[in-house]
Amino acid sequence: MEIILFDNKINSRFNKVTSTNYAAKLDQTSEIWLFNCIENTQHIFLKSQLKLSQITKIFISGTSFKYAAGLPGLLSSLTLSGKINTVSIYGPNSLKAYLQACTKYSQTNFSFSVNFHAVSYGKLVSGQSYTVICLPLSSNKLLYGFTILKKQQQGVFNLKKAITLNISQGPIYGELKGKHNFLSPDGYYLHGEDFSSSTTLGNKISIPVVLKYSRIISEMHWLSSYTVKSNTYPHQQATKYLLSNIETNVMNYQVSQDNNLIE
């Protein structure tokens, strides 16, 4: 899986911080999952090598307008591009009413179906390869974080080798794929590990959001396979613009210290 960070900078003109926006490009399929939808997201796609038509899921992490400011425009752009496949949107309950109002007053009809799913603590998406878990990041449940779990992939059975050794097709193929060993009637030793490729271990990817340090942030990053690159700012610069709503180098240090204690 490839995670692409869309630019998020301190806006010194308006004294605010834009929300964090990521696109996740899946390995085995051509799908793109979008985490938050800032303004002009469709223009960012046009400047990159990503394709709008490959977006299948959109995750919105908060009720604030900045997390979904570009969502109506993005959906309209998908319609103009001729998209017909269903798009699933995961977000707070108020987001559904917001989208319905946007389509009503702008008299916009989408060329594809939109499935809305209200986010809550627990498992949001469960597929063959990936699982997405939602965690509330505030006590009032107005802000959420997402963790992607990539499942362990079993090795591929080497059918060509089995045919070469004249092994008849049947339940023994499954046993060999399961790394079991056998001794054939003619005395030939069949080593299960030789008949399948290595198992690919799963991993954990936590999608960070712009937020002040908290214990739940540390738990999200605990045992993560790797940290998603995000823009961090010096503590003094951050507090100058927004006191408690930005990721700083101090916060990163606190998260790493917590993880060391847990381990």
Swiss-Prot record:
One of its GO terms (cellular component) is chloroplast. InterPro entries: RibonucZ/Hydroxyglut_hydro. One of its GO terms (molecular function) is 3'-tRNA processing endoribonuclease activity. Gene3D superfamilies: Ribonuclease Z/Hydroxyacylglutathione hydrolase-like. Its main location: plastid. Keywords: Chloroplast, Plastid. It is found in: Plastid, Chloroplast. Belongs to the AtsA family. This is Uncharacterized protein ycf56.
